[in-house]
Amino acid sequence: MTYETNTPTEESIIPKHEDGEEYNSIYLSRFEKDISISQTLDFSQFMQTQILLTAKRKALELGDDRSPINNDPYNIRRSDFDELSEYTASKSPSIISEASHNSPSRELDDSGDENTSKLTGTKQSMLKARNRQAAQKCRIKKKKYLQTLQDQVNYYTSENKELLQSANDLREEIIKLRTLVFAHRDCPVSKACSKALFLMGKEKPLTPP
């Protein structure tokens, strides 16, 4: 980092008057000019320079001849000022926080957060749409399955009724046949059949229906 300073010559130094006012006013303007900051300084160096300027003004207002700025203005250190640490602790954080709040990186973070929120919203919308489609397909599949089961129930119910009707018809047919056979039990043909069945071991007594 670079500083743009003008080193004073012996001719440019103004001796201090007894009251010190003329010396202080002229010397303050020269001091501010000598420590002018170029645009290439970073923020921390800028803050340090501003703190030194404030300390210089306060020292001149108090008229303290023992101020390190009055004694050796071109060899100033932080430890020479009692109020420097307090001023830094009270003023610098607010200025730094304000600068960081308005910094381009903060703007980039905000824009990144907005893009992230938009992307998250888009993903959520797509996820909800997929969930709706999946739920609709599941409902359609379940409806088809239930309809298939109902069709099977109807089919087997109808078939059962038909089989029951056929069983009843067959029972009636059996009763009719047994009635006819019993009516012809004294017929020679019936006797011959009974004898043949007896010889085969399958004869059964004829009973009325």
UniProtKB/Swiss-Prot annotation:
Sorted UniProt keywords: DNA-binding, Nucleus, Transcription, Transcription regulation
Principal cellular location given in the protein's record: nucleus
Entry GO terms, CC: nucleus
GO BP term, pick one: regulation of transcription by RNA polymerase II
Compositional bias segments (type: Polar residues): 90-103
Subcellular localization, as worded in the UniProt entry: Nucleus
Family recorded in the similarity comment: Belongs to the bZIP family.
Name of the protein this chain belongs to: Transcription factor atf31
